[in-house]
Swiss-Prot record:
Substrate binds at residues 106, 341. S-nitrosylation by NOS2 (iNOS) activates enzyme activity. S-nitrosylation may take place on different Cys residues in addition to Cys-526. Residues 1-17 form the signal peptide. Glycans are attached at residues 53, 130, 396, 580. Dual cyclooxygenase and peroxidase in the biosynthesis pathway of prostanoids, a class of C20 oxylipins mainly derived from arachidonate ((5Z,8Z,11Z,14Z)-eicosatetraenoate, AA, C20:4(n-6)), with a particular role in the inflammatory response. The cyclooxygenase activity oxygenates AA to the hydroperoxy endoperoxide prostaglandin G2 (PGG2), and the peroxidase activity reduces PGG2 to the hydroxy endoperoxide prostaglandin H2 (PGH2), the precursor of all 2-series prostaglandins and thromboxanes. It comes from the Eukaryota. Pfam families: An_peroxidase, EGF. Its cofactor is heme b. The gene is PTGS2. This is Prostaglandin G/H synthase 2. The conversion of arachidonate to prostaglandin H2 is a 2 step reaction: a cyclooxygenase (COX) reaction which converts arachidonate to prostaglandin G2 (PGG2) and a peroxidase reaction in which PGG2 is reduced to prostaglandin H2 (PGH2). The cyclooxygenase reaction occurs in a hydrophobic channel in the core of the enzyme. The peroxidase reaction occurs at a heme-containing active site located near the protein surface. The nonsteroidal anti-inflammatory drugs (NSAIDs) binding site corresponds to the cyclooxygenase active site. The record marks 516 as: Aspirin-acetylated serine.
Length: 604
């Protein structure tokens, strides 16, 4: 009887079909809802489409689709016709109109309030209210699907170590054709670690960055306790120390702030800053020092303007000003460089004041994943006339003191970074991080590359060759994954063919830009009630924000005002080496595979 009952249970289990939403039948951002065990419904509400699978466009949608150019066409227009864009840039009303279109068209791709997280693939109060989760652009692959990507591809995904070694690991350094430099690379790492703070104890779906945006917690600390330990409580300033006549962060001993340093690091080199991991490399501590100096400089400006203000108001207002400076630098210098546009991007919150726009943000897990730009890192770091490998560079603040900030800025402004797209450019020192990125994406059950392309209104790739733009890697990827609709998001972003003379491929830009711009303009200081001079201490503070740039940040805080930018100024440097990512493994053995990067987080 027991055996017969067990057989009956097995038969019933096998008789149940897979979740009908496993095949992602609902198109154009329609929401799939199972009905019973083998039926589904697509909710097409406000998608502009109708039909069983939300695949038939409404009349107005059909017109919009006919008139709307493809993302690659838009990119081509914005990166060519320089004379036309010079005219647009010189007329404020034209520049404002284009910038408004850029902001609205990008930010509307991000759902606000947030909808899903790793635990909930459907809308729930928990997924909205629990700030300890990263949100999700797409829900996780449904439970019980025939394959890891739903219904497409093989029953098991290929070994992540094999993916890294075959397609991601560097054979020979491939420089970025856009000329991106190490000032950019370390700015990216420093800036994003105020909101990419995966909780290693709870797993990749969780974050310790509860501010979910540009809150400068990497400068001031995530908690009030950490902030208070870092503050001087005089004139609004942060604690500091003077070394060789210059301002540097205080030590762990002086602040009792927890930082991550190996045991052998001497006390006087254990600098304490807002982010506990910023002792990892001197490039991060360089920016931490610059922003510390900037905060205290702004406090001096406000103190002169408002001698009646107490320490708390000077501190809080200076923080708001630095948030504004950060957003302006990110849009007008950082994103401007990445875009390659001849159109000049503009930070002007007033452009959105008559739009439906929510001044809140939630960091998405996919945004965190796509920001793993480890191919930017070179094999060695060149500072003045010295060269440091990873082993010499990690946890070595003595390099910062030995050379000083001026030499750091000058050297990193000259050193070119690596190309991110195109494959085979992750340095050996970061291969374990790349593997962990793939493993964690699988743990969080990300949908396929093509599902994310559809979510962000891109045409799905029809083949691996279309994805990579070449034949060798495409054939190997097809053998491992079996179907282009089963290709994973993270490795796809790194092997995708770059746009012409660009650092990224199409998917990285078209997914990353909406997350980025929504996060920046969704900041409370950009809202109508905040964006006014009185918020920032009057016209003096407002002017600091509105005139901020990466160059002014350096000039105000680094001795000698060294020239800087986010790209090398000699265009020949970026053209010096032409490398095919499908080349042989030559040069790989020259890299020491024992280099120790912190494995506690894939974000470093």
């Amino acid at each position: 009887m027991l055996a017969r009952a067990l057989l009956l249970c097995v038969a019933l289990a096998l008789g149940h079909a897979a979740n009908p939403c496993c095949s992602n039948p609902c198109q154009n951002r329609g929401v799939c809802m199972s009905v019973g065990f083998d039926q589904y419904q697509c909710d097409c509400t406000r998608t502009g489409f109708y039909g069983e699978n939300c695949s038939t466009p409404e009349f107005l949608t059909r017109i919009k689709l006919f008139l709307k150019p493809t993302p690659n066409t838009v990119h081509y227009i914005l990166t060519h016709f320089k004379g036309v864009w010079n005219i647009v840039n010189s007329f404020p009303f034209l520049r404002n109109a284009v910038m408004k279109y850029v902001l609205v068209s990008r930010s509307h791709l991000i759902e606000s309030p947030p909808t899903y997280n790793a635990q909930y693939g459907y809308k729930s109060w928990e997924s909205f209210s629990n700030l300890s989760y990263y949100t999700r652009a797409l829900p996780p692959v449904a439970d019980g699907c025939p394959t890891p990507m739903g219904v497409k591809g093989k029953k098991e995904l290929p070994d992540s170590k094999e993916i890294v070694e075959k397609f991601l690991l560097r054979r020979k350094f491939i420089p970025d054709p856009q000329g991106t430099n190490m000032m950019f690379a370390f700015f990216a790492q420093h800036f994003t670690h105020q909101f990419f703070k995966t909780d290693p104890k709870r797993g990749p779906a969780f974050t310790k960055g509860l501010g979910h945006g540009v809150d400068l917690s990497h400068i001031y600390g995530e908690t009030l306790d950490r902030q208070h330990k870092l503050r001087l409580f005089k004139d609004g300033k942060m604690k500091y120390q003077i070394i060789n006549g210059e301002v540097y962060p205080p030590t762990v001993k002086d602040t009792q702030v927890e930082m991550i340093y190996p045991p052998h690091i001497p006390e006087h080199l254990r600098f304490a800053v807002g982010q506990e991991v910023f002792g990892l490399v001197p490039g991060l501590m360089m920016y931490a020092t610059i922003w510390l100096r900037e905060h205290n400089r702004v406090c001096d400006v406000l103190k002169q303007e408002h001698p009646e203000w107490d320490d708390e108001r000077l501190f809080q207002t200076s923080r708001l000003i630095l948030i504004g400076e950060t957003i302006k630098i990110v849009i007008e210098d950082y994103v401007q460089h990445l875009s390659g546009y001849h159109f000049k991007l503009k930070f002007d919150p007033e452009l959105l004041f008559n739009q439906q726009f929510q001044y809140q943000n939630r960091i998405a897990a996919e945004f965190n994943t796509l920001y793993h730009w480890h191919p930017l890192l070179p094999d060695t770091f060149q500072i003045d006339d010295q060269e440091y490998n990873f082993q010499q560079f990690l946890y070595n603040n003595s390099i910062l003191l030995e050379h000083g900030l001026t030499q750091f800025v000058e050297s990193f402004s000259r050193q070119i970074a690596g190309r991110v797209a195109g494959g085979r450019n992750v340095p050996a020192a970061a291969q374990k991080i790349a593997k962990a990125s793939i493993d964690q994406s699988r743990e969080m059950k990300y949908q396929s590359l093509n599902e994310y392309r559809k979510r962000f209104r891109l045409t799905p790739y029809k083949s691996f060759e279309e994805l990579t733009g070449e034949k060798e890697m495409a054939a190997e990827l097809e053998a491992l994954y079996g179907d282009i609709d089963a290709m994973e998001l993270y490795p796809a972003l790194l092997v995708e063919k770059p746009r012409p003379d660009a650092i990224f491929g199409e998917t990285m830009v078209e997914l990353g830009a909406p997350f980025s711009l929504k996060g920046l303009l969704g900041n409370p200081i950009c809202s109508p009630d905040y964006w006014k001079p009185s918020t920032f201490g009057g016209e003096v503070g407002f002017k600091i924000i509105n005139t901020a740039s990466i160059q002014s940040l350096i000039c105000n805080n680094v001795k000698g005002c060294p020239f800087t930018a986010f790209s090398v100024q000699d265009p020949q440097l970026s053209k010096a080496v032409t490398i095919n990512a499908s080349a042989s493994h030559s040069g790989l053995d020259d890299v020491n595979p024992t280099v120790l990067l912190k494995e506690r987080s894939t974000e470093l």
